[in-house]
Amino acid sequence: MIDFELKQKIDEAKKKFEDIIKVFHPENKRKELEELEKQMGDSDFWSDQRKAREISQKAQRIRKIIDDMKDIEAKFEDLDAAIELSDEDQSFVETIKEMVEEIEKKVKTFELELILNGKFDASNAYLTIHPGAGGTESQDWASMLLRMYMRWAERKGFDVQIVDYQPGEEAGIKSAMIYIKGDYAYGYLKYERGVHRLVRISPFDANKRRHTSFASVNVIPEIDDDIDIEINPEDLRIDTYRASGAGGQYVNKTESAVRITHIPTGIVVTCQTERSQLQNKETALKVLKARLYQLELEKRQKQLEEIQGELKDISWGNQIRSYVFQPYTMVKDHRTNVETGNIDAVMDGEIDIFIESELIHFAGIRNKQ
C-alpha cells in the first residue's frame, strides 16, 4: 500500500495532465491531423514545395504530441495496475515511486511541447553575446555566458558550433555567435534574449572590489531558405579577413573569414568557422536573412504594441536575470522571480529551471491577451 505523500504526488500528476489535456483538445487535434494528412495525399501536394514543407512539419508536430499523450496515458494505466498490486506486495512501492518520477518528467515535457507552438519554435537557433561597458570584466562575463549556453546545449544533446568569435584583448570576448542545432532549440532559447547582470568581486581588480557587469544575449531562429526576405546584392558590402578565435574543435583558423554589412539597415554579420570563403559567405547570408526577418517581426510587434498598449513585462530589451557571486550566491530571473543559490550549476549549463518557467510564464501572458 502506498503512503499519503506518494498518493498526493500521483493525484497531482494526474490533475496536471488532465488540465493540460483540457487546453490541448485532443479531438480537435486529431481532426486537424486528418485534414493535413488528406492534403498531403493530394497528387499536386508538392507543386508548392514551401507550403508542402510547412504542412508536413505541422503534421509531424501534431502527430508527435498525440503519440506523447498516448504514451503518458499508457504510463498512468501501468501505474494504476502497480498500485493495485502494491496492496498485496509492498515491494511494488519503490517501483511506483520510480514510475511517478518518470511520469512527472513526461508530463512536464508534454506541457512544454504544447507551449512551443510558435512559427519558428521548432527551428535551430543562432545565439549572439555582446559584453556591455566595463572592459575586461564585462568581456570575461560574456565568455562565461557563452560557456553556460554551450554547456546547456550539450546537455540537451544539441550540436553546437561557434560561427563567430572575437576574443578580448586581456580576457573574455568582444562578441561571439553560436549555432545551436536541435529540435526546438529556438523555442527553448527565445526568452533568453535580453541583458544579463553579473555581481562579483572582480579577479581583474587588484583592490578586490565588487563589480557589476552586463552582457546582452540575442537569439534568432535559423530561417528557411524559402522565406520571403529579399536581399539586394547592391545593398551588401562584403569584406574578407583572417580568422581568429578560441581554437580547438570549434574554430577553424583560416584566411577565409567574411564580414557582410547590410547598408540600408547597418546590420553587420561575420562568419569565420567554415573551411572556405564561399561557405562562410553562405552562412553569413543565412544569418543576415534571419536578422532581417527578426527586424521585420520587431516592426510588426511595435505596431501591435502601439495599438494594444505596451506590455512592458514581455519587453526583451530589459534586464532579465541577475547572477550574484558575492556577498552571497544567487541567480534570479526578474520576470518570473524564479531563483536558485546553486550558481555553479547554473554556470555549468543547468538553466532549464529558468527556461521552463519563462515558457510557462509567457504562455500565460499570451493566453490573457
Curated annotation (Swiss-Prot):
The modification N5-methylglutamine is found at Q249. This is Peptide chain release factor 2. Keywords: Cytoplasm, Methylation, Protein biosynthesis. Gene3D superfamilies: 3.30.160.20, 3.30.70.1660, Release factor. InterPro entries: PCRF, Pep_chain_release_fac_I, Pep_chain_release_fac_I_sf, PrfB. Belongs to the prokaryotic/mitochondrial release factor family. PANTHER family: CLASS I PEPTIDE CHAIN RELEASE FACTOR (PTHR43116:SF3), PEPTIDE CHAIN RELEASE FACTOR 2 (PTHR43116). GO terms for molecular function: translation release factor activity, codon specific. GO terms for cellular component: cytoplasm.
